[in-house]
Amino acid sequence: MKVLAAMSGGVDSAVAAARAVDAGHDVVGVHLALSRMPGTLRTGSRGCCTIEDASDAWRACERLGIPFYTWDFSERFAEDVVDDFVAEYEAGRTPNPCMRCNERIKFAALLERALELGFDAVCTGHYAAVRPGPDGSLELHRAADDAKDQSYVLGVLTADQLAHCLFPLADTPSKELVRAEAAERGLSVAAKPDSHDICFIPDGDTRGWLAERIDLAPGPIVDPEGQELGTHAGAQAFTVGQRKGLAIGRPAPDGKPRFVLEVRPKENKVVVGGRELLDVDRITGIRPSWAGAPVPEARTGAWFDCALQFRAHGEIVEARARQRADAAGHPGWEIEPARPLRGVAPGQTAVLYRGTRVLGQATIDTARNARLSAPADA
């Protein structure tokens, strides 16, 4: 099989490519140049997609004896990931740029070009698995290593995309074994630290980065009843569940800290309240997609049992869900967790599971507060 190995410059993609070579595939390595911004290209940057990463990817391919290329996807990355990130914050939502990058760059733009060039599959270092289901159709599953599992950020993949995905690290029980294997193979990235930051905000200062791109203006901080408590420097720079950065001179009546409950960009307001008001008992999702064949209940709109994860490496909770159209007729999901969840924000991604299988995903549109709402209907 002709395989295009996406080489990030990290240890996972290097070992994944090595295993693809061992499996007898005709492997070609490619590194994606995603940004020309100085903050992400300087030597020693903490984000990914740096000049150092490109050099490490080249050295890994040289060690493996496979061809190496660099593809410039910076323009599409800027439009589909960076601009989208800014637009979501402007709308008062909390986006996941890694999810968007997988959806529109790594498994859309990259895969499309790979197929055009005659490749059969794209190989990455993601910790996830593609397995046949009972009917023979392909399904996305969690990896053997729960601590490193990345099936959440791959929940955007479709059945057609899964047919061209190769995840050689799927059954590896720990990251330590991947590093040990890299060292045995003589790969220079064996001890390279993982990247944890948003790649285009390597210093981690999301608020400062947004302030340079969004027209932030001071506005009121209010409680759920609308009483003004203080002033913020820009509503769009806040996210649900945030506590830091709230300039509130007046303490809460119970003396407990306040958290962001809601961001209202059109009114330029930030609504705050006690921690207990972050509890959510019903979620609606928009722009849903299925990672493989939909569950049978999707055709009828009936409730189905599942498990829910709403942030990368976050907890997975039992839930029920159903597919429903909104008032405009657009498809969506309604999700009810078995217990209230804390800190769910519009813009995050809700990924549904059944056992180890990823059923699919949707972007969270609304999250209903459990303490301020009426009981759910059946």
Curated annotation (Swiss-Prot):
The protein's Enzyme Commission number = 2.8.1.13
Amino-acid positions noted as binding ATP in the UniProt annotation, renumbered to this chain: A6, M7, S8, G9, G10, V11, D12, S13, L32, G125
* Disulphide-bridged cysteine pairs: C101-C199
GO biological process, alphabetically ordered? tRNA wobble position uridine thiolation
**Keyword tRNA processing (UniProt):** yes
Region of interest: Interaction with tRNA: 148-150
Query: What is the protein name stated in its UniProt record?
Result: tRNA-specific 2-thiouridylase MnmA
Q: Which organism is it from?
A: Micrococcus luteus (strain ATCC 4698 / DSM 20030 / JCM 1464 / CCM 169 / CCUG 5858 / IAM 1056 / NBRC 3333 / NCIMB 9278 / NCTC 2665 / VKM Ac-2230)
Q: What is the lineage of its organism?
A: Bacteria, Bacillati, Actinomycetota, Actinomycetes, Micrococcales
